Curated annotation (Swiss-Prot):
Pfam families: CPT, SPOUT_MTase. Specifically methylates the pseudouridine at position 1915 (m3Psi1915) in 23S rRNA. SUPFAM superfamilies: alpha/beta knot (SSF75217). It catalyses: pseudouridine(1915) in 23S rRNA + S-adenosyl-L-methionine = N(3)-methylpseudouridine(1915) in 23S rRNA + S-adenosyl-L-homocysteine + H(+). HAMAP family: 23SrRNA_methyltr_H (MF_00658). Its EC number is 2.1.1.177. GO terms for molecular function: rRNA (pseudouridine-N3-)-methyltransferase activity. This is Ribosomal RNA large subunit methyltransferase H. S-adenosyl-L-methionine binds at residues 73, 104, 123-128.
Length: 156
């Protein structure tokens, strides 16, 4: 199983890439994280948010690994604790499907993509910069894995 993070956005600051890389390099070979950046659509020429999200959805769908479990990050998603994420990981590994975490663009994710998702997950009740979400998600995936391995990284 492989973990994918599909994120609408590009040209993140160096500190975002550095933070993201720090956690992805800690992951074991059987749980590698791959980032797939999706170029955001321009909101020029009077385009509506709906048309932008629909165009971004098409790009996201083209980048999704075939048969992957989709975890869409959304402000109206379910709140999971780190322990709940840690409990989900082994089951996901056992079923063998790749897992794709999807971070939308500035306008969010298209409703069709959210409806198709296996899980709608809220990473925070606060509004966060999309680059920061990449780092937080990578850290939480590493922490969840460390919990499943009784690794000392997580001390609770």
């Amino acid at each position: 199983m492989k973990l994918f993070i599909l994120a609408v956005g590009h040209k993140m600051p160096g500190w975002i890439a550095s933070g993201f890389d720090e956690y992805t390099k800690r992951m074991p070979p059987e749980l590698r994280i791959e980032l797939r950046e999706i170029k955001p659509e321009l909101r020029s020429g009077g385009r509506s948010a709906d048309s932008v999200m629909a165009a971004e959805r098409q790009k996201i769908e083209a980048a999704l690994p075939k048969g992957a479990r989709i975890v869409a990050l959304d402000e109206r998603g379910r709140d999971w604790t780190t322990m709940q994420l840690a409990q989900a990981l082994p089951g996901w590994q056992q079923d063998g499907r790749d897992v794709a975490f999807v971070i939308g663009g500035a306008d969010g994710l298209d409703p069709e993509l959210k409806a198709r998702a296996d899980v709608l997950l809220r990473i925070s009740s606060m509004t966060l910069p999309h680059g920061m979400v990449r780092v937080l998600l990578a850290e939480q995936l590493y922490r969840a894995w460390s919990i499943t391995q009784n690794h000392p990284y997580h001390r609770a």
